[in-house]
Regions:
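Basic, helix-initiating cap at the start of DNA-binding domains
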Residues: 1-25, 29-38
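The DNA-contacting recognition helix of HTH DNA-binding domains
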Residues: 12, 43-44, 54
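Short amphipathic alpha-helical segment with a characteristic S/N-K-E followed by hydrophobic residues
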Residues: 15, 52-58, 67
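Short, basic, alpha-helical segments at the C-terminal edge of helix-turn-helix-like DNA-binding modules
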Residues: 32, 62-69
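Short hydrophobic/aromatic patch on the recognition helix
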Residues: 39-50
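Hydrophobic alpha-helical connector segments
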Residues: 59, 70-98, 150-153
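Short secondary-structure transition hinges
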Residues: 94-128
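Hydrophobic/aromatic-rich alpha-helical bundle segments in the mid-to-C-terminal region
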Residues: 105, 135-172
């Protein structure tokens, strides 16, 4: 990789990480100027690399979801007891849900929908493996099918994604 390509890649990673840190503001409240300031790049660089605010947000969301899949894989492979893993998984899911308002934002983007579908394809086997670990440890009854557990888990996640998510604010 030549120097220009490497610097471009590093700058894009910085922009996407800065955007990820701003996702809690809500997509409508994120401004290119805020991303540029946080990433310490010019707004022009962002437009040159991505073309629009929508595209930088989608790229950042894709980076975030890929990072979270990796974290999920690491969590499942740890030696901690199943119940602790479950608690961390639920916390992980709650944090992820906060970023899922991008669904409504990009529901017309077929490439993004394909990306979300591929994420589901990656995470489903992880969840099945997690279920199997729970059965092996005796924390999940053997007679409950993986399909049933996946159905309920998906139903819970779907219901959470359709709930309005309040922005965190200081309470006096």
């Amino acid at each position: 990789m030549n120097g220009f390509t490497r610097r471009t890649k590093e700058k894009m990673e910085t922009i996407e990480e800065a955007t990820i840190s701003l996702l809690d503001l809500g997509i409508d409240n994120i401004k290119i100027a805020d991303i540029a300031a946080k990433a310490m790049v010019s707004q022009v660089s962002i437009y040159n690399y991505y073309g629009s605010k929508d595209k930088v947000i989608k790229a950042a969301f894709e980076r975030l979801m890929n990072n979270q899949i990796q974290c999920l894989e690491k969590l499942i492979e740890t030696d901690m007891p199943f119940k602790e893993k479950l608690e961390q998984l639920l916390t992980f899911k709650k944090q992820t849900i906060n970023h899922l308002n991008i669904y409504k934002y990009s529901s017309q983007d077929t490439q993004f929908i394909q990306f979300l579908s591929s994420l589901y394809s990656k995470s489903s086997p992880l969840f099945i493996r997690f279920i199997q670990m729970g059965k092996k440890s005796g924390d999940i009854r053997e007679n409950v099918s993986d399909t049933t557990l996946m159905f309920y888990f998906d139903m819970i996640v779907q219901s959470l994604t359709h709930l309005p998510i309040p922005h965190t604010s200081a309470v006096n």
